[in-house]
Amino acid sequence: MKQQVTDPFQAIGDPSRRFMLRLLSKESLTINSLAQHFDMTRPAVSKHVKILYAAGFITIQDMGRERHCSLNQKGFHELQSWIDYFDQFWQTRLKRLDDLLNKKTKK
């Protein structure tokens, strides 16, 4: 399956896809096994799987007639970098505020 680049934030914007990632964090599953957890058609589940694959969150391995889905750690790097950036941003801001408040209380 050819992998297209998809915005990872858009990919995780759907609650069904986030739940699929949670399920796959426990074990690799076939698309049919994933579909059993949702009140949607198998083609709809396949569409969500394709989006997660295109965003790099999962890998798909064909084994006979079944397609096995697994999490792909590399797919989460962009999200982690974005979160780390803003985590550092807020830590710096809060440290400055803390320093300022401590200065004022010492006066």
What are these regions (language model features)?
Residues 1-6, 11, 22-37, 42, ...:
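C-terminal regulatory/oligomerization modules of transcriptional regulators
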Residues 62-68:
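Short, Lys/Arg-rich nucleic-acid/phosphate-binding segment
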Residues 18-20:
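Pre-recognition alpha-helix immediately N-terminal to the DNA-recognition helix
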Residues 14-15:
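Helix N-cap at the start of a conserved alpha-helix in ABC-type nucleotide-binding domains
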